[in-house]
């Protein structure tokens, strides 16, 4: 029997599901329990296809627009995703007489309120974020047309020419890189000293915590694996943070079978984290894949302990989930385990 080479896996903590993702998944599960299938969900509830597929198997139907819901099903509930929606979406739901449950992350809702507060004070709103991301679309959709400008890069900040430089306020997308946002803000605040900040930090605690844990683990890592979907903003930012913080290479993966072990080169230290919408079962799957090839020692790279929770909608608080539902909500679904074994 061949002797396996030693390998240290630095496991970041915190990682994976945040309180907003937990809440959003729970809302869909509770709605299915209370109202029965189908429950419609506008956009992916969170950006992870395994979560989406698991909810589909339980009776959720995902649509991008409300007019995709058949008329014969418009008595069924519809859930708005964790990323938030423009004001026009609940207005359209009311026009269709739809019963809707808002799963917008409370921290995203807070950004919406901060943006509207700026507008009430007659400030033009600068939104730092990524064009096309559902959260950005939702935040911009809270404001009057022409009342918000999207700034994506330092170059955008350098060339921005507002009509009234003395009446500006900013908010940010919650899932941005802390460093990138700081660079953009530095430019904006130097150019526009009167720029009004939000009353509270826009980048969410989970984004900051996961980035800090990645920074702590990156130096000396031959490889840094981030579990997450390509359309997950916070997961892509973790890859960038790992690269900037000293990892020799950093890769975004959705499953263990995406890792090309034959081309990784010599490894002695691999660091591992997961975006806020990535289930823990995929982290377990990746560790198992490495154990088949290496003599693995796990080191925990923990920077903070998270204990945040968010309440679900009042209509759902009397519903009890099964142990299987709880396992799915916590990212440890037996259904996913079975898929892993079939790989």
UniProtKB/Swiss-Prot annotation:
Catalytic activity of the protein: isopentenyl diphosphate + 2 oxidized [2Fe-2S]-[ferredoxin] + H2O = (2E)-4-hydroxy-3-methylbut-2-enyl diphosphate + 2 reduced [2Fe-2S]-[ferredoxin] + 2 H(+); dimethylallyl diphosphate + 2 oxidized [2Fe-2S]-[ferredoxin] + H2O = (2E)-4-hydroxy-3-methylbut-2-enyl diphosphate + 2 reduced [2Fe-2S]-[ferredoxin] + 2 H(+)
BP term (GO), one: isopentenyl diphosphate biosynthetic process, methylerythritol 4-phosphate pathway
Name of the top EC class for this enzyme: oxidoreductase
HAMAP family, alphabetized: IspH (MF_00191)
Binding-site positions, isopentenyl diphosphate: 47, 83, 133, 232-234, 277
Protein name (Swiss-Prot/TrEMBL): 4-hydroxy-3-methylbut-2-enyl diphosphate reductase
EC number of this enzyme: 1.17.7.4
Functional pathway: Isoprenoid biosynthesis; dimethylallyl diphosphate biosynthesis; dimethylallyl diphosphate from (2E)-4-hydroxy-3-methylbutenyl diphosphate: step 1/1; Isoprenoid biosynthesis; isopentenyl diphosphate biosynthesis via DXP pathway; isopentenyl diphosphate from 1-deoxy-D-xylulose 5-phosphate: step 6/6
Pfam families: LYTB
